[in-house]
Amino acid sequence: MIIPNLPSFFVPLVGLLLPAITMVIFHLYIQNDDIF
C-alpha cells in the first residue's frame, strides 16, 4: 500500500524542491561570482 502512494507524494515534492535547489545554487553562483 505504501509503494503506490509514495510516487504520488514524491513526484510533486521533487517537482517543487528541484527548482528551489536550482535557484539557490544559481543564486550562490551569482553571489560568489559577484564577490570575485
UniProtKB/Swiss-Prot annotation:
Transmembrane segments: 10-30
Role description: May help in the organization of the PsaL subunit.
Family indicated by similarity: Belongs to the PsaI family.
Primary localization class, coarse: plastid
Keywords: Chloroplast, Membrane, Photosynthesis, Photosystem I, Plastid, Thylakoid, Transmembrane, Transmembrane helix
GO biological process: one example: photosynthesis
Gene (name only): psaI
Membrane topology: Single-pass membrane protein
Subcellular location(s) of the protein: Plastid, Chloroplast thylakoid membrane
Name this protein carries in UniProt: Photosystem I reaction center subunit VIII
Record's GO cellular component terms: chloroplast thylakoid membrane; photosystem I
Species: Picea abies
